[in-house]
């Protein structure tokens, strides 16, 4: 089963600010995650059903949650890892 992709409004703003080359890298990984969104190695500790995609070379993270009832991968945040900024934004962005 393939999941659909949706963005939190603030995550969409963050996405649009990314350089096109970074967006392409995330798109490749998101395509894989839409087929299999629950990757145990990418699960965030301390968050219920939240996962991350890392672009290590540039230090960016994309954090998403999985909504099985509507078959959606919901992007919560996109940003740099420095000072855990991207992870702290999750508190106010739960779906």
Which ranges hold each PLM region?
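Compact soluble domain cores
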Residues: 21-35
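Short, charged low-complexity linear motifs
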Residues: 1-2, 45-50, 73
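A short, surface-exposed loop/turn module that caps and links secondary-structure elements
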Residues: 31-56
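Enriched for short, Lys/Arg-rich terminal
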Residues: 2-5, 10-17, 24, 55-60, ...
